[in-house]
C-alpha cells in the first residue's frame, strides 16, 4: 500500500477496524434457525412425491448434521471477520509507526492533518508554521513513508524467495 493512499483512506480504515472489532467482540454467529433454513431444500420438488416413512432422509440428515455445520459456519465467519480486522490493523499500525518515527513534532502535525478535525489554517496557527510548511511536511512524510513501504515490500519478497 502506498502512503498517499493511506493518507486518503486512514479515517475510513480506522472506522472499519473499529466496526470489525465491535463485530468480533459481540459475535454470536448464525442462529440455529438460520442454519436449518439454509440446509433445507428451498425449491419445490418436481412432480408428485410419495413419502412412505415418517421422516425423510433429508430431515434426518439435517437433524444429525446441523450442529456440526453450524459450528463450522460460525468458525469460518469469525475467522473471516478476524482476518479482515488483522489485515486492516496491520496496515494502520505500520502507517502510524512510520509517522511516529518522523519525530514527535512532525508526527503530531501529521496526525492533526489525518484527523481532519482542524483545517490547515488552524493547524498552522496551532503549531506556528505556514500552510506552505504544512504542505512540505505532508509531502516529506509521504516520501518517507513510501520508502518504508518499499523497504517492507523488499523484505517480504526477500523472505518469499529464501
Model-derived segments and their meaning:
Residues 91, 102-106, 137:
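N-terminal positioning helix adjacent to the helix-turn-helix/winged-helix DNA-binding module
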Amino acid at each position: 500500500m502506498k502512503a498517499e493512499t493511506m493518507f486518503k483512506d486512514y479515517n475510513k480504515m480506522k472506522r472499519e477496524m473499529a466496526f470489525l472489532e465491535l463485530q468480533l467482540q459481540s459475535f454470536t454467529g448464525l442462529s440455529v434457525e438460520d442454519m436449518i433454513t439454509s440446509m433445507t431444500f428451498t425449491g419445490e420438488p418436481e412432480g408428485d412425491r410419495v413419502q412412505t416413512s415418517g421422516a425423510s432422509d433429508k430431515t434426518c440428515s439435517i437433524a444429525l448434521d446441523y450442529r456440526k455445520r453450524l459450528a463450522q459456519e460460525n468458525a469460518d465467519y469469525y475467522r473471516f471477520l478476524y482476518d479482515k480486522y488483522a489485515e486492516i490493523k496491520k496496515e494502520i499500525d505500520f502507517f502510524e509507526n512510520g509517522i511516529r518515527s518522523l519525530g514527535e513534532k512532525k508526527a503530531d502535525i501529521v496526525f492533526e492533518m489525518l484527523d481532519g478535525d482542524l483545517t490547515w489554517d488552524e493547524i498552522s496557527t496551532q503549531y506556528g508554521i505556514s500552510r506552505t510548511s504544512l504542505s512540505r511536511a505532508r509531502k516529506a512524510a509521504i516520501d518517507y513513508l513510501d520508502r518504508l513501504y518499499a523497504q517492507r515490500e523488499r523484505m517480504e519478497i526477500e523472505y518469499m524467495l529464501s
